[in-house]
Amino acid sequence: MKIFGVAKIGMLLALTLLPAAVNAQNKAKILIHVTYGEDAPTRAALAFLVARTAADQGHQVSVFLAGDAVVLLKDDVLNSLAGLGTGKLREHYDALVKAGVRFYVSGNSAKARDLGPALIASKPAEFALPERLLALSLEHDRMFTY
């Protein structure tokens, strides 16, 4: 009987700790790579919506903007872009900032579009090169590209 009692206590303890262990294991580092800009508002907003959803679920999220997507951090674009069924970019962006999401902006793409340091001023963002994108992709568990 003592062995059964110890086994029972062990099982109860394991079942008590299991949800915390499973919950911790289900949290991932997610990288969202965005290449669509204001010319494809639904795709652009969808990328931010997926990032926001992941952050809301407690995942660690990073967003890398490249190509046409670098303009998405311009204040006028943040304030005006809305996707069809994917929400307003400003609302998603504000939620991402509140969740502590870091933004990486392709320095080459920004330079090609005459976007300088003012683009990321007062934003949780930094310019990055392709090498940084590759490093981020290897550091994260999952990568989504829009």
Residue ranges: model-predicted function:
Residues 37-40, 68-72, 103, 109-113:
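Solvent-exposed loop/turn segments at secondary-structure junctions
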Residues 44-82:
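N-terminal, post-signal-peptide region of Sec/Tat-exported proteins
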Residues 81-107:
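A glycine-rich helix N-cap at a beta->alpha junction
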Residues 24-25:
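Boundary of Sec targeting at the N-terminus
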Residues 1-11:
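Bacterial N-terminal signal peptides that target proteins for export
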Residues 32-45, 77:
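Short, glycine-rich nucleotide/cofactor-binding loops
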Residues 125-146:
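C-terminal partner/receptor-binding element of secreted or periplasmic proteins
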